[in-house]
């Protein structure tokens, strides 16, 4: 697969010392090669700002934005301002993604009818066992905008 098109992965960071390393490592290990990871420190009072700086020192694909706390949407918007990718992926800092997620997204975007790509979400117990698989949207199906909204309403699936 060609890696010409860059994906910007924006990660708002706030009070996630325990989860941040797993999240960032899942992003840096992507099989799709042309990514930038934008960690937006949203004024986190713990060690997250220093952790973000260390990730940037270790990998030049990592950009850091340090800002005053403004909430999730404000942090995402701050990341979007410095993003240089043609596509944007938002990942919450207490989450992680499969190693081939970006590659699969890029393959899915080859369908000329695609405006948005929705990934699956699985809740995990502290012991690592799967708790709930959140996706009722069927894989590999192209929905119209109206069909997607109807499906999301039926499944009670709305994500920030």
Residue positions per predicted region:
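Structural signature of beta-strand start/N-cap positions in the alpha/beta core
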Residues: 8, 34-36, 60-63, 115
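Short aromatic/hydrophobic "clamp" motif used to bind/position activated sugar donors
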Residues: 88
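Glycine-rich, basic loop-to-helix element that forms the pyrophosphate-binding segment
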Residues: 67-83
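Short beta-strand/loop segment that forms part of the nucleotide-sugar
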Residues: 34-43, 63-68, 92-93
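N-proximal low-complexity "stem/linker" segments adjacent to membrane-targeting elements
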Residues: 1-29
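Acidic helix N-cap motif at the loop->helix transition within catalytic regions
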Residues: 21, 46-54, 66, 78, ...
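A conserved acidic beta->alpha catalytic loop
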Residues: 26, 41-50
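Donor-binding/catalytic cores of nucleotide-activated saccharide
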Residues: 93-160
């Amino acid at each position: 697969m060609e890696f010409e098109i860059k994906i910007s992965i924006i990660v708002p960071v706030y009070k996630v010392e325990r989860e941040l390393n797993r999240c960032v490592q899942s992003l840096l290990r992507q099989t799709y090669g042309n990514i930038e990871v934008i960690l937006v420190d949203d004024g986190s009072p713990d060690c997250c700002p220093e952790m973000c700086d260390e990730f940037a020192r270790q990998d030049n694909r990592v950009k850091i934005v340090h800002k005053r706390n403004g909430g999730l949407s404000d942090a995402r918007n701050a990341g979007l301002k410095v993003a240089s990718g043609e596509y944007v992926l938002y990942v919450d800092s207490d989450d992680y993604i499969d190693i081939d997620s970006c590659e699969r997204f890029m393959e899915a975007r080859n369908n000329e009818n695609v405006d948005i790509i929705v990934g699956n979400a699985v809740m995990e117990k502290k012991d690592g066992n799967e708790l709930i698989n959140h996706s009722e949207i069927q894989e590999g199906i192209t929905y119209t905008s109206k069909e997607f909204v109807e499906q999301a309403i039926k499944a009670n699936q709305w994500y920030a």
